[in-house]
Amino acid sequence: MAQIAATKIAMVGLPEEAGDKFPSQLSGGMCKRSGLARSLALDPEILFLDEPTAGLDPIAAAAFDRLIGDLKASLGLTVVMATHDLDTLFAICDRVAVLVDKKIRIGTLADHLEDPHPWIRAYFHGPRGRAALDGNSQQHSAIDVGSQSLAGLA
């Protein structure tokens, strides 16, 4: 059991001594990583996350997004996440479910970016959506949105 804990603690980027500490002795970001290590302890195929970057500063949130993306790729995880963080959405998600008009719309980010529904347009193309799109396009290759790229939507 100790070896599994040490492996998962290292996997999420925590120092070895973090395993001997109480949550009150860890920073907010370290607590998030500790919770993630606990979630990975049983080697799940599906990882459920609820607002994983809530309470983190932008630098720590971006690092956590990269960690989730790396774990998703290296472990073959399916990640089901509830988030309102557009940066996280654009950094991690392959498919997105949006609740609008008491219905769930599921699609790729490109699908939602092209959706004509006023609320979806306001959410994904508003100031925060444009900032997330622009930040994502500068960090990664452009996501095709029909005949437009992310840079063309800002």
Task: Locate predicted features.
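H-loop/switch region of ABC-family ATPase nucleotide-binding domains
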Residues: 83-84
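A short, proline-enriched helix->beta-strand linker immediately N-terminal to the Walker B motif
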Residues: 41-45
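Conserved ABC ATPase "signature" region
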Residues: 2-17
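Helical segment within the ABC ATPase nucleotide-binding domain
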Residues: 62-74
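Catalytic Walker B motif of ABC-type/P-loop ATPase nucleotide-binding domains
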Residues: 47-50
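A short, surface-exposed alpha-helical micro-motif characterized by mixed small hydrophobic
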Residues: 89-91
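Conserved ABC ATPase signature
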Residues: 22-26, 30
